[in-house]
Amino acid sequence: MKKSARRQSRELATQGLYQWLLSNAAPGEIDAQLRGALGYDKADKELLDAILHGVIREHATLIEALTPSLDRPVDQLSPVERAVLLIATFELTHHVETPYRVIINEAVELAKTFGGSDGYKYVNGVLDKLAAKLRPAETQARRNG
């Protein structure tokens, strides 16, 4: 199945954030490497830039928003789980035009693609809790169906 430009952007953002979390490389250096990555030409570059640079810029604020929904300290998350959760937290707070279920589903798919065997289940559970806090009206409306 062909990936959407938005999915491709999220995958590249995950790779870039993974690199940043492990090496603390400069955002410009990560940009340069991503431009040479497979699938870059098919990505929504505006979304990729918004996510990658937004998460790096707002890292501390995003961690603060995410932490109450975690069952362990942030530094005990795998780098992939942390990158995926940061992307989803950023999108939940900054891309309100995107339904929260879409954001969670995308994050679960990223965790399946890049993470450990059951990491996606953890990501799903954390984001369900987080979405209820960050988007209470939207999540309540869905639950009331």
Curated annotation (Swiss-Prot):
Keywords annotated in UniProt: RNA-binding, Transcription, Transcription antitermination, Transcription regulation
Biological process according to GO: DNA-templated transcription termination; transcription antitermination
Top-level lineage group: Bacteria
Keyword Manganese found: no
Alphabetical list of InterPro entries matching this protein: NusB-like_sf, NusB_fam, NusB_RsmB_TIM44
Cellular component terms per the entry's GO annotation: cytosol
GO molecular function: RNA binding
HAMAP family named among the record's database cross-references: NusB
Role played: Involved in transcription antitermination. Required for transcription of ribosomal RNA (rRNA) genes. Binds specifically to the boxA antiterminator sequence of the ribosomal RNA (rrn) operons.
Family according to the record: Belongs to the NusB family.
Family annotation (NCBIfam families): nusB
Protein known as: Transcription antitermination protein NusB
Gene responsible for this protein: nusB
